[in-house]
């Protein structure tokens, strides 16, 4: 008899059941690992799987997380180069791909990352045909479209992390100006995750009090308080962090875990995330952009119809045109 047999009397032989709340993260770079640790700290999964092509780094990251098991409540953390390890995932988060260099626009990454997606997405679909796909790799709006096209999934199950982070950055900066916690500062950034994102000034409020009603010049060039700068800071923030530390990781990791929580717990919270927007706001092409979406365990179930000012609507259309111009040239 082994020590284990001396210690433990077996009552019931457990069949190897699948995990019920499995999350897989594809790509164990700085962003993938920030997503992983944020998800682990929120106890969202009963199994977390990591996938990457660099096997030593992958195994090292897995071991490093496993060594923290005592402090976590996710009983199984595994990894592998082969996508069979991702089988039966509820949620698959894709962070893999080339990342922005200093001064490089997100749109510049596109063809490199499309080629990577041509390998990743079919493998994910093969092993988890019923999963929700959450795309984080940049340019996120275009790659969410690419993932939707390659996967053959219905639109509601292919989600881009989109402007969830841009809106969080906006609310943080707004809070800094007003001396109020970002949770109590309400404001939405929609459109492209990146340089052509659109701040919806008409909806910015604290406790339901419209800031634009109190300060009509808000967000315009005539504004003495230069609130437009807040949006400029949001657009510049990734570039600034990349310039200073080489990459961004923590904020996007927390933002993705926020979305994962809404999905895994079926919270039906509204998030500014990337979805198919054809037919909305005068957009005629098959593009994915961030709009306020109701998110839950089946993916995106509804879109909130924003009331936009004509100039805001115009900016969203321009965003869509920019993306379509790139999308229609893509080879996949």
From Swiss-Prot:
Binding site for substrate: 106, 138, 169, 248
Gene3D superfamilies: Lactate dehydrogenase/glycoside hydrolase, family 4, C-terminal (3.90.110.10), NAD(P)-binding Rossmann-like Domain (3.40.50.720)
Chief location of this protein within or outside the cell: cytoplasm
Pfam families in UniProt: Ldh_1_C, Ldh_1_N
PROSITE patterns: L_LDH
Location in or out of the cell: Cytoplasm
EC class (word): oxidoreductase
Single GO term (MF): L-lactate dehydrogenase activity
EC assignment: 1.1.1.27
Subunit structure: Homotetramer.
Protein name, UniProt field: L-lactate dehydrogenase A chain
Organism (species): Gallus gallus (Chicken)
Source lineage: Eukaryota, Metazoa, Chordata, Craniata, Vertebrata
Gene expressing this chain: LDHA
């Amino acid at each position: 008899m082994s020590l284990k047999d001396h210690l433990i009397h077996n009552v019931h032989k457990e069949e190897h059941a699948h995990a019920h709340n499995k999350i897989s993260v594809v790509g164990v770079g700085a962003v993938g690992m920030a997503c992983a640790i944020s998800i682990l700290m929120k106890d969202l999964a009963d199994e977390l799987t990591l996938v990457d092509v660099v096997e030593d780094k992958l195994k090292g990251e897995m071991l490093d997380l496993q060594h923290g098991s005592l402090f976590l409540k996710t009983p199984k953390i595994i990894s592998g180069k082969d996508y069979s390890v991702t089988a039966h995932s509820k949620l698959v988060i894709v962070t893999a791909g080339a990342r922005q260099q200093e001064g490089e626009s997100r749109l510049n990454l596109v063809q490199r990352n499309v080629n990577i997606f041509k390998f990743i997405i079919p493998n994910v679909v093969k092993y988890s045909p019923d999963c929700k796909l959450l795309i984080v790799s940049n340019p996120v709006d275009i790659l969410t479209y690419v993932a939707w096209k390659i996967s053959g999934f219905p639109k509601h199950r292919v989600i881009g992390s989109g402007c969830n982070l841009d809106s969080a950055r906006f609310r943080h900066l707004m809070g800094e100006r007003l001396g109020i916690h970002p949770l109590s500062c309400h404001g939405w950034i929609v459109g492209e995750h990146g340089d052509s994102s659109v701040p919806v000034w008409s909806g910015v409020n604290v406790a339901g009090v419209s800031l634009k009603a109190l300060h009509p010049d808000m967000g315009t060039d005539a504004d003495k308080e230069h609130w437009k700068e807040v949006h400029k800071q949001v657009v510049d923030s990734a570039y600034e962090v990349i310039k200073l530390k080489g990459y961004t990781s923590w904020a996007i990791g927390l933002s993705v875990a926020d979305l994962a929580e809404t999905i895994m717990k079926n919270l039906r919270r509204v998030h500014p995330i990337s979805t198919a927007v054809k037919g909305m706001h005068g957009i005629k092409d098959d593009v994915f952009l961030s709009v306020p979406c109701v998110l839950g365990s089946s993916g995106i179930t509804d879109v909130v119809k924003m009331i936009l000012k004509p100039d805001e609507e115009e900016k969203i259309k321009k965003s869509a045109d920019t993306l379509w111009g790139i999308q229609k040239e893509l080879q996949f």
